[in-house]
Regions:
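Extended beta-strand/beta-hairpin segments
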Residues: 1-46, 56-140
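Alpha-helical metal-binding/catalytic segments enriched in His/Glu/Asp
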Residues: 51-52
């Protein structure tokens, strides 16, 4: 079993700082919002994206899957009362020449073995798709 620890502290009424290991992330905890930091909802979505990308990094060697890059786009919908995320849609965009069957296999592995995405999927509607950035027939 793995364990994780993060500490966050208020800097001032405009922001907070989260730390773990030797890393820091500025948090938007300003009631008016701020453009130079992730607010809690954006940080939540970024955590899902990081989980998916890390999952891809984990399974590509096992699948002998070749790629040049990955981008994950997420869109969350929040209800007001009580405030919570009710659905999250994602697109995983892979720069690869692998065929559709292999791309689907990558997607299945990412969804099956993602700690954060599995946790979220138990609580919120999490749906999405995987696609490639290049058409294999024209990218050679």
């Amino acid at each position: 079993m793995l364990e994780y620890s993060v500490k966050a502290r208020r800097i001032d009424d405009h922001g907070s700082l989260a730390t773990t290991k030797q890393a820091e992330v500025m948090l938007d905890t300003d009631m008016s919002g701020r453009d130079d930091a992730f607010n809690p909802a954006e940080l939540f979505l970024a955590s899902i994206a990081a989980c998916m990308i890390k999952g891809i990094e984990r399974v590509t060697p096992m699948l002998d899957f070749n790629l040049r890059g990955v981008e994950v786009k997420l869109h969350g919908i929040r209800q007001d009362s009580p405030p919570k995320m009710v659905s999250i849609n994602y697109e995983i965009i892979v720069d690869t020449d692998e065929d559709d069957r292999r791309l689907d296999l990558l997607h299945k592995n990412v969804r099956k073995f993602g700690t954060i995405s599995n946790t979220v999927a138990d609580a919120v509607q999490l749906e999405g798709m995987i696609m490639r950035t290049r058409d294999p027939a024209t990218s050679k």
